[in-house]
Amino acid sequence: GGDNAILDAIVAQLRHIDPDLPICALSRTPKETRAAACVDSLYTFRLLAIRRRMRHAKLYLSGGGTLIQDTTSTRSLLYYLSSIRMAARAGCRVMLYGCGIGPVSRPRNCERTAKTLNRYAEIISLRDRYSEETLRALGVTTPEIHLTADPALLIDPGDTPAIRSFLHHSGLAEGTRYALFALRPWKDFDRHIAAFANAAEYAHREYGLTPVLYAMEPCRDRAALNAVAAQLRCPYLLLEAGSNGTEIVALIRRMSLVIAMRLHTLIFAAGQGVPIVGVVYDPKVSGFLDYLGQDLYLPLEEASAASLCDLIDTAMAEQMFEAENIRSLRELDAENEE
């Protein structure tokens, strides 16, 4: 899903710098990653093999995405901090690349994060101001810090026969317009199922947009989308993201509107100039949208049929995603290469 698309974007930037650069990605599914991204790959938890590879590498990139946070778990945070430490000790230069930071809320985790990043990271490029503020609050001052943009904004799926074939086989019909809903399970999500279903029906009734219920992370998101689908009384598609980042972005580009909780769905839509409505379950979502100058979002707990329909009206009326806004973000993202 989104992780594969991020990797595709990072690999493309690195290949732009040096087409022959050997790249090794850490992955939970290394066989799939090798095939999809055309890079070498090691299993995320093969620590001895990773350490051996690091001794022969010059640079360790941590990112994109939001890896330095303890919302998921302290264990997840400790893994990413320890990988940074291990890379530096193996002789790699360390860069956190086009990433989000935070929230880091537990006091002990704040100390660990500041200590590790101050000691081992050389450069940190961030995708939003919220992350910059989080680093400042943590006391991270030693690395060079640059506010750039998410690497995923640079993905260009093109308009190849393969892309057209993929869209056709996904069930997207020529001449039909679509509104994509990228939702995920979260605390009290069940209380808002009817609101999302009503909003999807509204988009269909008022604007002729067929709802696409899109599982960016299929294993996690499927149940939430099925619950919304069960309440729909209009035609819809239920689709799942595959492992090809270019195809994910091509599908999102085909949409007339995107309503999403999933951050990278919003990032991909913004990069393609598709109008977006954000539903915020985590500060990283509002942080990105604020950085974009985009105010069409609301917290999940305030998601009602009326509020969602109002935002849909505004997004459809503005029909912006200002090309100038996107261009400036892409220019910022190019700074990741520098």
Please report, for each region that a protein language model flagged, where it lies by residue.
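Active-site anion-handling motifs in enzyme catalytic cores
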Residues: 1-338
